[in-house]
Amino acid sequence: MSASGLPFDDFRELIRNLPGPDLGAERAVREREVTLTKPAGSLGRLEEIVAWLATWTGKRTPQVNRPLVAVFAGNHGVTAKNITPFPPSVTAQMVENFAAGGAAINQICIANDLGLKVFDLALEHPTGDITEEAAMDERTCAATMAFGMEAIAGGTDLLCIGEMGIGNTTIAAAIALALFGGTAEDWVGPGTGSTGELMQRKLAAVRLAVALHQPHLQDPLEVLRCLGGREIAAMAGAILAARMEKIPVIVDGFVASAAAAVLYAANPEAIDHCMFGQVSAEPGHRKLLAKMGKEPLLDLGMRLGEGTGAALAANIVKAAALCHSGMATFEQAGVSASK
């Protein structure tokens, strides 16, 4: 903890002083790219992905050998306002399903040869109902961010961030509204299927929560504390830890992007090592990516969460790295280069 004794101060200092890009590694990748047996630029965005990998790993021949999907699960007190068709008990049930190998993310990880870790964040203790009180106190929020930083402890060279939590699209919408303004209608979507009266209650909850906590919402970490969830705080911590350890990150959908948005609002450079795996069908996600100036890799109409979009995108990143490292140069292959 910092000398001031305030739990967030260490994170504020960290966010202000993050390691920057390795421009030498990026330059080396771009120089090799033009020597490979293909027309310059013909692999399109794959070439930019390799440059991004080099920039944030510091490796001149970037590889992806230990990709990991980290899924963070949390529960939310605001679900007591009857804003979602599923009860909060589903969060714990889905965590058990992940452990048993029965969820969509398990199958995608098998298909793409990705590691998977699931983090259960005190599911029996939901965060505070944000329409009545702060989601967390500062100490709890900071401790949860620190817990999220441990996601990389086992070693990985590409971190995919995902989540599970009934009610957390409401939380993500409230965070987006607090950070970027607009109206609740700009950010609130159906989530797991909220329509009709459920949708109206969801909209009302977001409006009420942002109005209630307005005096605290000038500081992005206070936005996280007042309106966030444990899984969102943990994802923010994981993103920061990855930056410190030169690990590129693929962010999944709307909720995971809300965690990244908190860091972006504190320092726009804090998520430069992040790629956004997909734009989800949740309507606020496309707007949120636009606010951060981010272009997603995939647009498949998905809105499941669980890290599924990030995991699918990881295979594209793996392929990009292999194309760069494995392709022969014109000289090696005896192929004539362009004039």
UniProtKB/Swiss-Prot annotation:
The active site is at E306. One of its GO terms (molecular function) is nicotinate-nucleotide-dimethylbenzimidazole phosphoribosyltransferase activity. Pathway: Nucleoside biosynthesis; alpha-ribazole biosynthesis; alpha-ribazole from 5,6-dimethylbenzimidazole: step 1/2. Its EC number is 2.4.2.21. GO terms for biological process: cobalamin biosynthetic process. Keywords: Cobalamin biosynthesis, Glycosyltransferase, Transferase. It catalyses: 5,6-dimethylbenzimidazole + nicotinate beta-D-ribonucleotide = alpha-ribazole 5'-phosphate + nicotinate + H(+). Signal peptide: none annotated. SUPFAM superfamilies: Nicotinate mononucleotide:5,6-dimethylbenzimidazole phosphoribosyltransferase (CobT). InterPro entries: Nict_dMeBzImd_PRibTrfase, Nict_dMeBzImd_PRibTrfase_bact, Nict_dMeBzImd_PRibTrfase_N, Nict_dMeBzImd_PRibTrfase_sf. Catalyzes the synthesis of alpha-ribazole-5'-phosphate from nicotinate mononucleotide (NAMN) and 5,6-dimethylbenzimidazole (DMB). HAMAP family: CobT (MF_00230). Belongs to the CobT family. NCBIfam families: cobT_DBIPRT, PRK00105.1. PANTHER family: NICOTINATE-NUCLEOTIDE--DIMETHYLBENZIMIDAZOLE PHOSPHORIBOSYLTRANSFERASE. This is Nicotinate-nucleotide--dimethylbenzimidazole phosphoribosyltransferase. It comes from Brucella melitensis biotype 1 (strain ATCC 23456 / CCUG 17765 / NCTC 10094 / 16M). The lineage of its organism: Bacteria, Pseudomonadati, Pseudomonadota, Alphaproteobacteria, Hyphomicrobiales. The gene is cobT.
